[in-house]
Design a protein with these regions (language model features):
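Extended, charge-rich alpha-helical interface modules
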Residues: 2-72
Length: 72
């Protein structure tokens, strides 16, 4: 694998990892909202996590669109 391909793969893996972290955080809010002391507004906290998920997902889509191995 070429260095450029490794960089793109690393960027994709980082975005995938961030996506999973934020999904897990939302699951914590969904299953234990009373147990999150520093977040009195769970809805706002979930919206913030969704925004972070959106950013990571957008990066994955950009990588697929512009740096896919299936480019013609």
């Amino acid at each position: 694998m070429k260095v450029g391909e490794q960089i793109i793969l690393a960027a994709r893996k980082q975005a995938e990892g961030q996506l999973e972290v934020h999904k897990a955080n939302i699951e914590v809010y969904r299953t234990m909202p009373a147990g999150i002391g520093e977040h009195s507004d769970v809805t706002e906290a979930v919206i913030a996590e969704l925004d972070k998920m959106s950013s990571a997902y957008d990066r994955i889509e950009m990588i697929e669109k512009f740096f896919s191995k299936n480019d013609n």
